[in-house]
UniProtKB/Swiss-Prot annotation:
One function term, GO molecular function aspect: zinc ion binding
Domain of life: Eukaryota
Protein name: Protein BREAST CANCER SUSCEPTIBILITY 1 homolog
PHD-type zinc finger locations on the chain: 632-681
Length: 941
């Protein structure tokens, strides 16, 4: 019993979690869970996650597990030796049957022939039904769209195909047709040895087939069951598509294909290299050839067999589904040519023989020439040449397609370089493979991963079979084809955006006239769409047409819009001016080929840039201004490129010229090319200052006083009288305002206009009087001008002095109006400063050195340093060192402003420690300001 329990435990470990039977062709996932190959294949159709742990996986992550199959084989041998059957495997033949299957190859051949015969019987029935279906292809009724896989085909291996089935021409065609519904152009041949193909390479899972042929019987049975059904449209779970990036060489194309060398293993297209346990992707030489190419190589096949195979295809996929598949094209790459093929197939169906196909194509080509001749002869030659060039531009692929076209119809005449028929163009593009393929799904239901495989199958196709199987059911899908074509043309050919609509409209009009002339109203929509496709193809390929094609200039407007480098706008407005183009400073035309070195700017944007000027026609500093403006955002729209700043230097607003023109409050100087923003509208522009100087010059009397009132207006006369009445004002008198209100500034401006004194906005050593604002207590705020005026010994007066001068119309003494106190309580600072300057005493901080440490705001620290230097002190850039001087002359200044890093106590202690080590004194920033405001050095605490 102990042995039985161990055997039972081993059997549980060797069970598949899906089918609960012993592993059959075991494979493992990236999560190390093991399943049967067939089980995980079926599971992946519904959900690409591990059935045990639900971890997502891709098809490339599935790897064979031969060691598990070896364990299953050992387990079965142990069961046979013990005589106990604990678990039932997926197929459990008797030991005697196993030995017979391994030893006797003749029995296997016989069973293969029997199965082959049964398939032939079923195929003949489908053949008969297909013939009736072909006759009644236009019968009324709903069109049933059966799903079909459009990706790289995943097939069940046909384990039991005999070698004789591929040697006979008739059996080869019919055998390739039977799995057609599921395998899509796959022909498989296995030799007598189950592990070797014709070249002697090991087949996939060869280690499994040597173990037990009895287990493969279940796979054969399952494959037989799947042959009669259409598989579910399964998306591809792998991005390994070797054939999308590689193509067979010319030698491989010219060689006669051997279907015995081509096979797919299950759904993964694995192959096994000799003496290698790794499962690798299929190489290029092992790709499955389309059955149409195989039909080309077997020249002994009669045409009757080809017709019967077409009928069989119509039974499996239905003729209407084939037409639906043709309507949406083989792929996004070849959809234009496939639409043209749909029209040609209609003409072919109305005539019925392949011999008339080329004649119809020639007629179609002549009709196209007649339509285009209504517009111009040059357009006809261009379109036909572009069709030919488009076919030649495909390189090796195009050469191979032309070769396959010639093989399929050797009696067809070859068109000239400018007379390439539509039929030859379509054959070269490889649409003919779709006629024998299964029915396609609806365009909206197609998986995105199906397109690459459609491209592959479209390139490996046959001409005659395509032209014979096409039907005229494309009218219902015309609108959908136009949408898909237009969207693809826009996305993939964005470099050719102009001219397509104009040419297409003309061709549509010509196509309608030609159709009405031939009384073929049923094909109007299809012919129009064919013309659109051909015109789009010629427009796209005109760049590669070389000198063989005649190019025609489009009638539409192709003016390219340029974007201004400053305002980022491409439209020319009255505010921006016209668009100009400069190459290395020189003006050029719009179509000048200078690359990225050509600068496109509006005329006004360039003229109003601050540092840009013109030397004759050459523009100077344009690139420098562009570099500067790329870092400046517009105060109006927020975009970069705002080169135009406010005339007020202290204002930080910058604008695009076009944005500033939209603001009515902005003031402009068209002479100096400067602008004032709405916030500084009260400031005078250079042109206004010049006008005021001119007015002052005109006010100088050149005639007697009695004639003056007759020459000027009453208001000007009053001002002239006021100016004459102000006596005692020196021309060197310069006023500066400090903290005044708007009303007080207005009084100052009026006084300056009447008296002729100068007003300075910023502090300067030439300032003689500082007019400051005071509160109800007579104290003024500490400003930079106030502190500098104390150190320089200037007058610091209230606004009352200005009012007194205007009232008395003469110079009034300043002493009664001098400010004596600031808001911090320091008194007599302005008076002491004036006395120090009058007596020519040394400055306040003469002989003292200051080291500023701690966390100061940059602006505050800069103002503090300016005040110390103006007071005669010295700023140390490095930490002070100890000196032998008896009297300490170095002061370490720390900040008293609130800071997030350190408290006031910590900053004070740090300054005192540094001062002690350097034999210096520590002082706060408020001590420095108080000393300057009082014009005397205060005692350090």
């Amino acid at each position: 019993m102990a042995d039985t329990s161990h055997l039972e435990r081993m059997g549980r470990e060797l069970k598949c979690p899906i089918c609960l039977s012993l592993y059959n062709s075991a494979v493992s996932l990236s999560c190390n869970h093991v399943f049967c190959n067939a089980c995980i294949v079926k599971s992946m159709k519904m959900d690409a996650t591990c059935p045990v742990c639900k971890i997502p996986y891709h098809r490339r992550e599935i790897r064979g597990a031969p060691h598990m199959d070896s364990l299953v084989s050992i387990y079965k041998n142990m069961e046979d030796a013990s005589g106990i059957k604990l678990f039932v495997s997926q197929n459990n033949p008797s030991p005697s049957d196993k030995e017979k299957q391994v030893r006797d190859a003749s029995v296997e051949k016989a069973s293969d022939k029997n199965r082959q015969g049964s398939r032939k019987g079923r195929a003949s029935k489908r053949n008969e039904y297909g013939k009736t279906k072909e006759i009644d292809v236009d019968a009324p009724g709903p069109i049933v769209m059966k799903p079909s896989s459009q990706t790289k085909k995943r097939v069940q291996l046909l384990q039991n195909l005999s070698a004789e089935s591929l040697t006979k021409p008739t059996e080869s065609v019919e055998t390739a047709e039977k799995p057609k519904d599921y395998t899509e152009n796959t022909v498989i041949r296995l030799d007598e040895h189950p592990s070797l193909n014709k070249e002697g390479n090991l087949s996939p899972f060869f280690w499994l087939r040597d173990e037990d042929d009895g287990e493969n019987s279940s796979q054969r049975t399952e494959s037989d069951q799947l042959l009669g059904t259409t598989p579910v449209n399964v998306p591809s779970f792998s991005d390994l598509m070797d054939s999308d990036h590689e193509s067979p060489s010319k030698e491989d194309e010219q060689q006669k294909p051997n279907p015995g060398d081509m096979f797919d293993s299950e759904m993964f297209e694995w192959t096994q290299r000799p003496c290698s346990p790794e499962i690798l992707p299929s190489p290029v030489k092992a790709k499955v050839l389309g059955r149409d190419e195989i039909d080309l190589t077997q020249k002994k096949l009669p045409k009757v067999k080809v017709a019967s195979s077409k009928c069989k295809n119509r039974k499996a996929g239905s003729a209407r589904n084939t037409v639906a598949r043709r309507s949406i094209g083989v792929s996004q790459e070849d959809n234009m040519e496939s639409s043209a093929a749909a029209t040609i197939s209609e003409q072919q169906d109305s005539r019925g023989t392949s011999g008339t196909i080329i004649r119809n194509d020639v007629n179609t080509d002549e009709n196209v020439k007649a339509k285009r001749a209504t517009r111009s002869k040059a357009q006809s030659t261009r379109v036909q040449s572009d069709l030919n060039v488009s076919n030649e531009a495909d390189g090796k692929q195009g050469t191979k397609r032309k070769r396959s076209s010639i093989k399929s119809s050797p009696a067809h005449p070859i068109a000239g370089p400018n007379e390439l028929s539509l039929g030859t163009e379509i054959v070269g593009k490889g649409d003919q493979d779709q006629a024998h393929g299964p029915s396609d799904t609806h365009p909206e239901k197609r998986s995105p991963t199906e397109k690459p495989s459609l491209k592959k199958r479209g390139r490996k196709s046959n001409a005659s079979s395509s032209l014979k199987d096409l039907s005229g059911k494309t009218q219902k899908k015309t609108s959908e084809k136009k949408l898909k074509l237009d969207s693809h043309m826009i996305s993939s050919k964005a470099t050719q955006p102009h001219g397509n609509g104009i040419l297409t409209a003309g061709l549509n009009q010509g196509g309608d006239k030609q159709d009405s002339r031939n009384n073929r109203k049923s094909t109007v929509g299809k012919d129009d769409h064919t013309m659109q496709v051909i015109e789009k193809c010629s427009t796209i390929n005109k760049s590669s047409s070389g000198g063989s094609a005649h190019l025609r200039r489009c009638n539409g407007s192709l003016t390219k819009k340029f974007t201004c480098a400053f305002c980022q706008c491409s439209e020319d407005t009255e505010a921006s001016g016209e668009m100009t183009h400069y190459y290395r400073g020189e003006p050029v035309s719009a179509d000048f080929n200078g690359g990225s070195k050509v600068i496109h700017v509006h005329k006004n944007c360039a003229e109003w840039a601050p540092n840009v000027y013109f030397n004759d026609l050459t523009i100077v500093n344009l690139d420098v201004e562009l570099t500067r403006s790329r870092r400046i955002s517009c105060s109006c729209c927020g975009l970069k490129g705002a080169a135009l700043g406010c005339y007020n230097k202290s204002c930080k607003n910058s604008f695009h010229v076009t944005c500033a023109k939209l603001i009515p409050e902005c003031r402009w100087d068209n002479v100096k090319f400067v602008m004032l923003c709405p916030l500084d509208a009260s400031i005078k522009l250079p042109c206004e200052e010049a006008n005021s100087k001119d007015r002052k010059c005109k006010r100088t009397p050149k005639e007697p006083l009695h004639s003056q009132p007759k020459q000027v207006s009453g208001k000007a006369n009053i001002r002239e009288l006021h100016i004459k009445q102000f006596h005692g004002f020196s021309k060197k008198l310069v006023l500066s305002c400090s903290g005044l209100t708007v009303e007080e500034k207005t009084v100052i401006a009026e006084f300056a206009e009447l008296s002729g004194v100068t007003i300075s906005k910023n502090w300067d050593s030439t300032v003689t009087h500082v007019i400051a604002s005071i509160n109800e207590n007579g104290a003024c705020k500490r400003t930079l001008k106030f502190m500098m005026a104390i150190l320089e010994g200037k007058w610091i007066l209230t606004i009352d002095w200005i009012k007194a001068c205007m009232k008395n119309t003469k110079y009034v003494s300043e002493e009664p109006y001098e400010i004596t106190m600031d808001v911090h309580g320091i008194r007599e600072g302005p008076y002491l400063g004036r006395q120090r300057a009058l007596k020519k005493k040394p400055k306040l901080f003469t002989g003292l050195k200051f080291y500023i440490m701690g966390d100061f705001e940059l602006a505050y620290k800069g103002y503090l340093q300016d005040l110390i230097v103006a007071a005669g002190g010295t700023i140390l850039r490095r930490r002070p060192v100890s000196s032998d001087d008896n009297e300490a002359s170095t002061i370490v200044v720390f900040s008293v402003e609130p800071s997030k890093k350190k408290t006031l106590t910590q900053r004070r202690s740090d300054a005192e420690a540094l001062a002690k080590s350097a034999r210096a004194r520590a002082a706060s920033s408020s001590w420095v300001l108080d000393s300057i405001a009082g014009c005397q050095i205060l005692v350090l605490i």
